[in-house]
UniProtKB/Swiss-Prot annotation:
SUPFAM superfamilies: a domain/subunit of cytochrome bc1 complex (Ubiquinol-cytochrome c reductase) (SSF81648). Keywords: Chloroplast, Electron transport, Membrane, Photosynthesis, Plastid, Thylakoid, Transmembrane, Transmembrane helix, Transport. It is a multi-pass membrane protein. One of its GO terms (molecular function) is oxidoreductase activity. The chain crosses the membrane at residues 34-54, 93-113, 129-149. Belongs to the cytochrome b family. PetD subfamily. This is Cytochrome b6-f complex subunit 4. It comes from Liriodendron tulipifera. GO terms for biological process: photosynthetic electron transport chain. It is found in: Plastid, Chloroplast thylakoid membrane.
Length: 158
């Protein structure tokens, strides 16, 4: 339900005459946003990307040498937690079951949470706790995947 302005109100008419109130009742997208603001944002984004590419060019990587194999081949960074699970669990079937249990556990969170109508994370303690614990475990596994196998579980701290 939207509030409709009373255009017979003299206070509102005075505000509208001064140009006030256009944000409250909406502002047309044409021509203000689409003609003036959007091209500036698009060109600014392109300029930032080109500037970063020119000022800080990234290297493609080391040239390939077919006669020298690296000691340990690491996957891409987003596969580090999965790689760490498969590397540390002795039974590969158990490792696959652990990987399947992650999305399965995430699917059960809405059913465990009784107050799922709230968007505030402080009013959804189960979902917030699952998220925080999952984030810490994923970071721990991801950092551990970059270390040698004997230091990977303790991250070299103990």
């Amino acid at each position: 339900m939207t509030k409709k302005p009373d255009l017979n109100d003299p206070v509102l008419r005075a505000k509208l005459a001064k140009g006030m109130g256009h944000n409250y009742y909406g502002e047309p997208a044409w021509p203000n946003d689409l003609l003036y603001i959007s091209p500036v944002v698009i060109l600014g984004t392109i300029a930032c990307n080109v500037g970063l590419a020119v000022l800080e060019p990234s290297m493609i990587g080391e040239p390939a040498d077919p006669f020298a194999t690296p000691l340990e081949i690491l996957p891409e960074w987003y596969f580090f937690p999965v790689f760490q699970i498969l590397r540390t669990v002795p039974n590969k079937l158990l490792g696959v079951l652990l990987m399947v249990s992650v999305p399965t556990g995430l699917l059960t969170v809405p059913f465990l949470e009784n107050v799922n109508k709230f968007q505030n994370p402080f009013r959804r303690p189960v979902a917030t706790t699952v998220f925080l614990i999952g984030t810490v475990i994923a970071l721990w596994l991801g950092i551990g995947a970059t270390l040698p196998i004997d230091k990977s579980l303790t991250l070299g701290l103990f």
